[in-house]
């Protein structure tokens, strides 16, 4: 009966998600906002159609292997040739930038919600990740200048695993209840190193096994090979203290840039593989946001409306511009203009990875997880409704569209 219940709930989640797609298109609203609202309506607080308690087998799979697949997909779209000219700025945004954003948000969250610095930092770390899944179709529609578009998308893809690592490290400190010397810093560094090594090994293995060379013995089974390898990498990383999310992302980068390693795939097999990854990612995105809506505490959201909106103002108007300025201005090779910096400061949407991390924290009953989930919900709604809808207008005003000249 338990298996039947899981299958029923998963089927209903997908049904709710699929119904939301045409509604979002009809209303010209961001899909993820509609998915959250649909989840709320389907949840116990409104219709009672869905009840998906966090911590079950189904939600654990979505928030672990599902997110690893999303990060693999993000890495798959990164072109090392394209981002080489802005590599310094990207690395600064991805590592110290994530930490700086988390720290600034934490300073605001502490007095507003009356929580400890550790819990406030946990909230900031989860919010620090952005979402390439939202930005890619948005920029394709706008025709944004390639340098800006590719940098913002690459930053979003790279800082997702970094935000996840920082979040899980801080969550460990919060759960332990104390800061044990350099332990968290050591764990953070070890997670990164192990994650990179595992990711490189897994990416090379996947690229070779699916190649057009004699070694491509699994080229006709890309879906099963991908799932098996991602699962193996995820649980291996968890077992030895590495970042499974970073490993999945790095593996995606390796496969996406296989031509630099002189590894070729047949066009047919490559299209099948990329199509499978994209479709699987779509399913996970639908599930994550509907599950968030189902488990959303509307009372908690309304009770924290004012401090939540103040936190979002600090997040958008202070933390992001300060981080972008400190990380990109020193990047001489990038030759960033003021208008480009303004656009990059404004354009950052909160999406699936922060939502999934918040869900994982709730599942593990980490102290402060409800606050984190509430703030992530605010961030999703505010950034998608405010920033995503005004990005085109701002890009046009700043002269950052292809063929446009910057206004004087």
Across the structure, where does each feature detected by a protein language model lie?
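Transmembrane helical cores of multi-pass secondary ion antiporters/exchangers
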Residues: 1-408
